UniProtKB/Swiss-Prot annotation:
One of its GO terms (biological process) is viral latency. Residues 383-394 have a biased composition (Low complexity). One of its GO terms (cellular component) is host cell PML body. InterPro entries: E2/EBNA1_C_sf, EBNA1_DNA-bd, EBNA1_DNA-bd_sf. The record marks 491 as: Interaction dimer-dimer. The keyword Transcription applies. Induction: Expressed during type I latency (proliferating memory B cells and Burkitt lymphoma cells), type II latency (Hodgkin's lymphomas and epithelial cell carcinomas) and type III latency (highly proliferating B cells and immortalized cell lines). It comes from Epstein-Barr virus (strain B95-8) (HHV-4). This is Epstein-Barr nuclear antigen 1. The lineage of its organism: Viruses, Duplodnaviria, Heunggongvirae, Peploviricota, Herviviricetes.
Length: 641
């Protein structure tokens, strides 16, 4: 058993024992999908290279927890996993441990080790300390012995030690050294149990940032027994915070992803959460899927120091948002309806004071989007929600049912876009669109467009579209939509204009989400020069279900619509079908766009338009008529966009 003597290293996941039985294999943390989003959303499925028993599942890795991917507590992937092992493959762990550390500690070895008492001894004995073996003895860890500094510590060293997580379990685990070491070994963390023991939470124990780092958080066990998560988990980076403050730590453990999740979250909730947050550790937690946990109760935790938690992407989510950290760079961020920070650069971030921040940040890619969200909910001239909340309820948060709908929509009021694009010359793209990066065609750059100047200043410069309100040009995104529409319209060739040029028919398009409608509207403009489009606006509320108060006639909902004016009824029908077919193939918000045909008995007299240069001059390729039916009337600009 003690074949190779005490296992050496901290178990970088490679099982440096040479013999596969070393539980050392605890999972390494594998390059945790470090993907583009730095803020370790790292769901990390650590790859756990474990040489360990076959039993040793890869660790759960916690994803590089910080932008630079360094795992805070210690840079080596402190074998993150051997999650299940400690209890799991009872034999596995035991045996495995045995293998390496098994050394003397033999007790630690196999079930025996597992045995509380035996384990205790093992842990106690240097043997326990012995690399994995000791850890394996996890049991040792279990016993207060495990807690024992050396014992626990050693265990910690070997992934097995982690296994010893049990040790952590014992108050002993909490014991400084003991806990810490354990933490070192992923096992430590793993032995969520360890964390479990108050000991784990215990300062030093928690300190075993490693532990936290380790699957500790990962070990669902760890995360699970909120406690477990607390101790070890918190230990994770959070551990730094005395173990994330007991439970809080757990949240931090979140890093373990698993830990963070579920119970972990709870931990976050507890003040502990705050503590964890405090330490960078907190952030770590956020990093792991733990973030998820954060979202839940974690959120509460976030409230407190949670801010730190916020740091982790997850953190950002629920709680994080809450805490100042909220902004966190995490994507979830905004979720937190917390007062929180203005949301770092994360996607949802802004969080701002009203939970659903203004998602301005939306395109992480785009540098500009950076912090820009209305940080603290401050000047938002008219928030749709507060607008007319008839009740005296604090207008700040829309009625419960409503929030989710906002989110996807990219919430600002429609009009806010004017203010926003402004000077940066990315005039007309509502936040959703921004995701595309600066797709706006450069031609639209200077805020007043080439021609605006000669305009006699007819309207304020800047604003949404560089030139006049409503002359958005083409750009690859809208062109794409237009292409789809043209293809569908090509199915039937019908008259689109009449000699009278009166606008007697229309298509009313509504639903979906504001951004999807907006984009469809811009696409329609490119596809059908013969139509005229109203700006996007909002539908009023209809009836309240059941008896009871009905909405006021003026009450605006957040559902948008726009109208397409056309000259022939037949083309209106064709266009309706085309739009229906175009949106039904698309994903969520878009496919919910609804269309219906209208007809205007006496037609709608759209005001005549004269090309801008000189009254009546045939500028812009228009034929100088009153623009009523000149097909390219107001789209004339398109060419020079």
């Amino acid at each position: 058993m003690s074949d190779e003597g005490p296992g050496t290293g901290p178990g970088n996941g490679l099982g440096e024992k040479g013999d596969t039985s070393g539980p050392e294999g605890s999972g390494g943390s594998g390059p945790q999908r470090r993907g583009g989003d730095n803020h370790g959303r790292g769901r990390g499925r650590g790859r756990g290279r474990g040489g360990g028993r076959p039993g040793a599942p890869g660790g759960s890795g916690s994803g590089p927890r910080h932008r630079d991917g360094v795992r805070r507590p210690q840079k080596r992937p402190s074998c993150i996993g051997c999650k299940g092992t400690h209890g799991g493959t009872g034999a596995g762990a035991g045996a495995g441990g045995a293998g390496a550390g098994g050394a003397g500690a033999g007790g630690g070895a196999g079930a025996g080790g597992g045995a509380g008492g035996a384990g205790g001894a093992g842990g106690a004995g240097a043997g326990g300390g012995a690399g994995a073996g000791g850890g394996a003895g996890g049991a040792g860890g279990a016993g207060a012995g495990g807690g024992a500094g050396a014992g626990g510590g050693a265990g910690g060293a070997g992934a097995g030690g982690g296994a010893g997580g049990a040790g952590g379990a014992g108050a002993g685990g909490g014991a400084g050294a003991g806990g810490g070491a354990g933490g070192a070994g992923a096992g430590g963390g793993a032995g969520g149990a360890g964390g479990a023991g108050a000991g784990g939470g215990a300062g030093a124990g928690g300190a075993g940032g490693a532990g936290g780092a380790g699957a500790g958080g990962a070990g669902a066990g760890g995360g699970a027994g909120g406690a477990g998560g607390a101790g070890a988990g918190g230990a994770g980076a959070g551990g730094a915070g005395a173990g994330g403050a007991g439970a809080g730590g757990a949240g931090g453990a979140g890093a373990g992803g698993a830990g963070g999740a579920g119970a972990g979250g709870a931990g976050g909730a507890g003040a502990g959460g705050g503590a964890g947050g405090a330490g960078a550790g907190g952030g770590a937690g956020g990093a792991g899927a733990g973030g998820a946990g954060g979202a839940g109760a974690g959120g509460a935790g976030g409230a407190g120091a949670g801010g730190a938690g916020g740091a982790g992407a997850g953190g950002g989510a629920g709680a994080g948002g809450a805490g100042a950290g909220g902004g966190g760079r995490g994507r979830g961020g905004s979720g937190g309806r917390g007062r929180g920070g203005s949301g770092g650069r994360g996607r949802g971030g802004s969080g701002g004071r009203r939970g659903r921040g203004r998602e301005r940040a939306r395109g992480g890619s785009r540098e500009r989007a950076r912090g820009r969200g209305r940080g603290r909910g401050e000047k938002r001239p008219r928030s749709p929600s507060s607008q007319s909340s008839s009740s005296g309820s604090p207008p700040r948060r829309p009625p419960p049912g409503r929030r989710p709908f906002f989110h996807p929509v990219g919430e600002a009021d429609y009009f806010e876009y004017h203010q926003e694009g402004g000077p940066d010359g990315e005039p007309d793209v509502p936040p959703g669109a921004i995701e595309q990066g600066p797709a706006d065609d450069p031609g639209e750059g200077p805020s007043t467009g080439p021609r605006g100047q000669g305009d006699g200043g007819r309207r304020k410069k800047g604003g949404w579209f560089g030139k006049h309100r409503g002359q958005g040009g083409s750009n690859p995104k809208f062109e794409n939509i237009a292409e789809g529409l043209r293809a569908l319209l090509a199915r039937s060739h019908v008259e689109r204009t009449t000699d009278e040029g009166t606008w007697v028919a229309g298509v009313f398009v509504y639903g979906g989400s504001k951004t999807s409608l907006y984009n469809l509207r811009r696409g329609t403009a490119l596809a059908i020069p013969q139509c005229r489009l109203t700006p996007l606006s909002r539908l009023p509320f209809g009836m309240a279900p059941g008896p009871g108060p009905q909405p006021g006639p003026l009450r605006e909902s957040i559902v948008c619509y726009f109208m397409v004016f056309l000259q022939t009824h037949i083309f209106a029908e064709v266009l309706k079908d085309a739009i229906k077919d175009l949106v039904m193939t698309k994903p969520a918000p878009t496919c919910n766009i609804r269309v219906t045909v209208c007809s205007f008995d006496d037609g709608v007299d759209l005001p005549p338009w004269f090309p801008p240069m000189v009254e009546g001059a045939a500028a812009e390729g228009d034929d100088g008529d009153d623009g009523d039916e000149g097909g390219d009337g107001d789209e004339g600009e398109e060419g020079q966009e």
